Amino acid sequence: MQVKIESLAAQPLFALRVQGPFAQSLGPGFERLMAWSTRHGLQGQWMALYYDNPREVAPEALRADVALTTATTALPSDGEASGIRWDTLAGGLYALAQVRVIDNDFATPWVALFDQALPASGYRPDGGPCFERYLSDGRASGEWLLELGVPVRKS
């Protein structure tokens, strides 16, 4: 896995909070956000933001946001009633890795990033949510191309 360290600008987005095991909570969350964004004609990049470490937090307590990047700061009128909020992914220094997910196994690239690639980079996590940016839609095939992002600081 190749990791690059980049300074990213803050990214505005529409987000929907989900809680529970990631494999069970993210899909329904994305379906809700996709239906809502389609009703409003919104387009952007799809992301998932992760707030908890699954090695430290019980599966039922894991928090994540499913998100759609946006260029606007205006939340459509039914956003709050739908559980959707306007938010910003903080800018700053991130470790980024482009990975391929096979058979919907999203955990393996994250483990490789945190256990091997990130320590070898000379950087360490700096708090704040990690993210997945979806570069392809693998719903039908189970094969995804995505970018993993972790806020970092020099070790």
From Swiss-Prot:
The Swiss-Prot or TrEMBL record annotates one GO molecular function as: DNA topoisomerase type II (double strand cut, ATP-hydrolyzing) inhibitor activity
Alphabetical GO CC annotations of the entry are: cytoplasm
Q: Which UniProt keywords apply?
A: Cytoplasm, Stress response
The protein's assembly and partners: Interacts with DNA gyrase.
Free-text function comment from the UniProt entry: Inhibits the supercoiling activity of DNA gyrase. Acts by inhibiting DNA gyrase at an early step, prior to (or at the step of) binding of DNA by the gyrase. It protects cells against toxins that target DNA gyrase, by inhibiting activity of these toxins and reducing the formation of lethal double-strand breaks in the cell.
Family, as annotated: Belongs to the DNA gyrase inhibitor family.
What's this protein's name?
DNA gyrase inhibitor
What would be the name of the gene that encodes this protein? sbmC
